[in-house]
Amino acid sequence: YNLFCSFAYTIYNMSHSMMVPLSTRNSSQRGLLSVFNQVASIMVTGIFVALLFPMLFLPFMGSSKTVWIGVMSVICVAMFPIMLLEYYFTKERVSEEQGKTQTVKVPYVSQIKAVFTDKILVLLLAYCFISSIGSTLKTSTMVYYCNYVLGTYNDGITQVLINVIGGLPMGIGIFAVWPLAKKFGKARLTVFGLLLVAIGSLVSWIAPTNMYIVLTGQFIKNIGGLPGAYLFMALFADSFDHLEWKTGFRSDGFAMSVYSAIVVALVGVGTAVLNAFLTASGYIPPINAGSLAEAEAILAQNGWIPQMSLELYKPTLDGTFTIGIMQSEATMNAISFLYLGLELFTGLICAGLFAFVGVEKTLGKKQQMIRERQKKACEAEGKVWVAPEIRLEQEQKRAEEEAEADFRRELQARCEKKGLDYQTELEKHIEEVRIKEEKQAEKERLAKIKAEEKAKIAADKKAAKLAKLTPEQRRKYDARMEKRKAREDAAWEIERAKGEIIYNKMQAELAAKEAKQ
């Protein structure tokens, strides 16, 4: 357990989570990547955890340690080749960009100071901590809630209903979250979602034993959880660019280490808190018996009442019987609070935190300043500045040329071995490449036309809306827009001035430390 949580999971999770912020600086692409990354981690795993596992596996696994270890071993082995795919087919563009311009090694102490003195990152890490408390305890308590409050032990259906019906929005959200985030902003949409989480938790907590009310509340709560689940990593990545603008160096590694430490540590803490609640409330674990007669004797000896008539229980895979016990009211109240009620409070607190996360508003200006600094540093070293996107195209072209040369050498060797005409086979290959390039060019042309048409429709729609205004309404609208722009410009100037002070201070500290070495 310690080897997995302390080392293996921490190393993998931190590195995997870093791929979103390091893949691109484009905030729009990064947001979309975050959504699809979370789709993979939430939806695909959800299909197994929410549907197949409780319905097909859990009733037959019981509480046998041998069976559980066997199942987990198979899952771990299946994960390995998939992790290799991620390793070989991903690219850290931001890291490569930094490597070409940043020569000063940033001390770990400076990164710690940068992260914990930045308001936006502190707010996001606080959100991560509080939301992880709620989600970890909820996840840990789900089996107990489905087994003892809403259903019976390993009935194979209660947990499926909770996950499928209550979690249906997680599937719908793929198509809704990103368009809404582009329209209203990632942080603003997340605040609204967290308020829905609190409302849904309250609805469920009112009647924790009523299946219909609980499913309604869970449906509302999961709608509210969509922005946080799908967009948090995109906002976290935006904050890394913000911090780079503010300090002159990236602290992604340390910030992500803190994030991973929170997530991993709270798994153990959540288990400890759950066990403390269960122990204090008088929880009685299920019993394992070799036969129903033995189970009946154990129940009679302790004065316990089974959840169902003993005749209804079926043997597990190892031939034993796992019997669920009726719990006390105190135990069921404790379980209901951890599964349903806790996120009422964590949702409200997190909404309050996110209300002050304004990293998106000036991100474009900050990224432009970062690029100007990189250009200046590059030219100061006597090098020719090449924009990252152009350099990426050049590197991609070189990689394709090298791959083509390798293919032709392999083709020639294969033709010599099989007695084929190399020139004929090469002409076939060249024709295939030409057709492929033409299709790709046509695809890009159509995508460009579609984007231009979409932008034109949006512009025409806005123009038509403004045209409907009376002269007085238009005057007020223009005045309101000018006032908003002036307010935003003034806020940016204040932030920029403060950021420049911190940037100069951080750079001076780095220069002093570099001089001492």
PLM segments and residue spans:
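Membrane-embedded alpha-helical bundles of multi-pass transporters/translocases
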Residues: 1-390, 412, 419
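Intrinsic disorder in cytosolic terminal tails and internal cytosolic loops
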Residues: 304, 309-329, 358-517
